[in-house]
Every structure is written in structure tokens, then in C-alpha cells.
């Protein structure tokens, strides 16, 4: 145990001298205190998840001159390797991925990126209207979505439900489902569920109320729509069904007609 602590201290001291590369090409010393705080935030309220262990694993994956945007990726990889030790590490890993996604989306929309605070509700509320407008402008979202009361829907978002994701579920959404432009994801998880809900509620008489009902159901994970609905609801290609059933006679002419 003493040797392990000594190795950890030596490892930490050596990383105090590392430089990280910023987006403008300049470099600055690695802020180990900030990194430790970020990891503490990802571990909050997760039993059997050890902040120090994730920090040690992350430091092993850092190198001098590493781009600052790569540090979150190193953190994700490091936390992911610990899932075998305790299942709760999957939630810590998902939170690290969430932080990356928040930064990616808010940077794209030119919004403040200091999002890992206690004000997730304010961030989502402010972000949501920008997200809808940009999605419409990029011809990714149905212009009819702008006819909804976006203020009301933004306030109905439940940012705390972002914490429900396991790493694999969030990574799957990130890789396959979230809206993106030029390979940049700008759709956050709760906006994703609300976009689907809005697409489903477009023809309803009280469409905002119905959208909120659909959103609350989807974002609770009590019900999940089929893949075509997740892909297409609220977009310019509103195909919602997975398949179509019809009746044909038992001969090739009918089958191919």
C-alpha cells in the first residue's frame, strides 16, 4: 500500500510539469487541480467509484504537449477501463462524455461552455432555442418546429435526466443518433428527446402539452421509440415506422408488383 501511494505521488509530481496545447497553438501547464475537480464531479454520489483511481489512470494516458481537447478523451478511456471493477464506473464515464458533448454542442452554437456547474437547467433553457433555430437553418429540422412555444418547452426540459445514461447508451446516441453538422454534434440528450416529442406532437391540438408528455415518457426511459422515429421525428424526413405490412398473393408476379 505504501509503495502504491509513493508511485502515485511520484506520478502526480511528474505530471505537474506537463504542458497542454491550446486551440490557438499556445501551451500552458497542466492544471492538475482543475482536472481533479472535474473527475470529482463525475464521481459525485456514485458509490464504489474512486476519484483517485480515475485520476491515476488518466495521468498515465497524458503526454507533454497533449491538445487540451484530448484530455477529456483520455479521462473517458481511463474511466471506461474501470467498469469491470464496479458497474458504477459506467456512469462516471458517461458523465465525462457528457461534458465533452456539452462543450462540442455549445461551441458550435457559440454559447458559453462553462456548463459543468449546478445550473444545468439554465444552460438547457438558453441552449434549446438556439439549437432549434440552428437545426432549421441547416435544413436538418422541420421548420414547423419553430411554431412551438420554445420558451415553454425549454423550461420543461429535465437536465438531471442526463445523469441516467450508462456509457454505452450515451456513446451509441452520440455515434448514431444526435444531429450533427460537419461531424460536430450539437444536439444534447434532453433536446434529442424533446425534438422527437415535438415531431410526434405536431398534429395535436395542444401540441406543447402533448410534446411535454411525450418528452417526459421518453426521457424517463420507461418507453423508447423505434429507431426510425429516433432518427427522423422532427426532421425533414418524418418517417416514423420501422416496417410496413401488406398482403400479397403467393406468386412471384404479386410479390414483385
Residue ranges and their predicted role:
Residues 1-257:
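Extended catalytic cores of very large enzyme megasubunits
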Amino acid at each position: 500500500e505504501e509503495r502504491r501511494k509513493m508511485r502515485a505521488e511520484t506520478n502526480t509530481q511528474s505530471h505537474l510539469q506537463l504542458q497542454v496545447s491550446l486551440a490557438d497553438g499556445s501551451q500552458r501547464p497542466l492544471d492538475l487541480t482543475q482536472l481533479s475537480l472535474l473527475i470529482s464531479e463525475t464521481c459525485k454520489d456514485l458509490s464504489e467509484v474512486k476519484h483517485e483511481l480515475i485520476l491515476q489512470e488518466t495521468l498515465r494516458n497524458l503526454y507533454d504537449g497533449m491538445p487540451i481537447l484530448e484530455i477529456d478523451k483520455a479521462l473517458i478511456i481511463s474511466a471506461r477501463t474501470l467498469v469491470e471493477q464496479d458497474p458504477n464506473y459506467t456512469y462516471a464515464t458517461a458523465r465525462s462524455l457528457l461534458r465533452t458533448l456539452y462543450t462540442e454542442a455549445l461551441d458550435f452554437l457559440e454559447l458559453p461552455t462553462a456548463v459543468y456547474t449546478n445550473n444545468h437547467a439554465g444552460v438547457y433553457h438558453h441552449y434549446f432555442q438556439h439549437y432549434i433555430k440552428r437545426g432549421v437553418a441547416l435544413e436538418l429540422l422541420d421548420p414547423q418546429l419553430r411554431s412551438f412555444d420554445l420558451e415553454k418547452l425549454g423550461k420543461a426540459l429535465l437536465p438531471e435526466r442526463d445523469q441516467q445514461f450508462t456509457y454505452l447508451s450515451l456513446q451509441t446516441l452520440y455515434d448514431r443518433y444526435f444531429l450533427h453538422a460537419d461531424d460536430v454534434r450539437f444536439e444534447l440528450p434532453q433536446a434529442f428527446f424533446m425534438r422527437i416529442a415535438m415531431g410526434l406532437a405536431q398534429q395535436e391540438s395542444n401540441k406543447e402539452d402533448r410534446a411535454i408528455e411525450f418528452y417526459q415518457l421518453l426521457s424517463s426511459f420507461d418507453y423508447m421509440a423505434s429507431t426510425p422515429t429516433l432518427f427522423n421525428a422532427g426532421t425533414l424526413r418524418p418517417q416514423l415506422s420501422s416496417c410496413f405490412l401488406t398482403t400479397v398473393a403467393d406468386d412471384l408476379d404479386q410479390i414483385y408488383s
